[in-house]
Amino acid sequence: MLLTQLPRATFYDRLQRKNKPDKYAALKAFIKKTFRDSYETYGYRRIHIMARKAGFKCSPNTVLRLMGQLGLSVTLYSRHTSSYHSYKGKVGTVNDNLLHQRFDAQEPFTVLHTDVTQVKLVDHSWGYISAVIDEASREVITIIVSNSANKGQLHLTLDDLAKKLPANVTPIMHSDQGWQYQTREYQSRVHAMGIVPSMSRKGNCHDNAPMESFFNLLKRERINRQPIKDLSELKQVVTHYVTWFNHDRISLNKNGLTPIEYRTQAAA
């Protein structure tokens, strides 16, 4: 219907609405920026928390509605990726499972998780990511990207972890039964660092669920969203993501806190 065919009252009502300033203009701009800064992974709940932190007075439903108007929706990139299997049987020390899937640590640096995952690169090589995360805060404490999941990568992981652990802590560190975690070098080093090793049951990834969850997020939220040509680019992508994850990515399970905020509040 042409505007000239509308009833006079309807015509002027529409004209007035069109010329009226958008009261949500600032909030819309904030939503778009927050969505972009989150690698387009934040849904309306997280964006609502961020908006409230920034001083906007709005409801979750308002954010949901505005995201719809702006055409913003989360896309999960869950393409199949090959899993890295480091289990080669009993080749050294197999530690007891001290956690039994009780992932309820509240204090940072009491329980840590570690593992290695692999990523296929455009140049047909593989990149291997070794990480250590904190169970309580979900902070990524250490992450090492290498072209091989060998003892060298393991040593670099432990060297970096040693620099970042506070003095006088004696955390449990849980891993799978991968060959590298059974070695005499690993066992001796973690004990010297005051770490108590714990291991999953053979072939049970659920025993190390927090670590599996992080690697899943890393791949869905970042790595799987773009072709990564080589190891150098993978290192850059992982470094940027981990910095954002620790300092900026809020968790709905942690009352809207980032891992660093959680650790800071726990230490206060």
What residue spans do the PLM features occupy?
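K/E-rich alpha-helical interaction surfaces of small helical-bundle regulatory domains
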Residues: 1-18, 37-39, 237-255
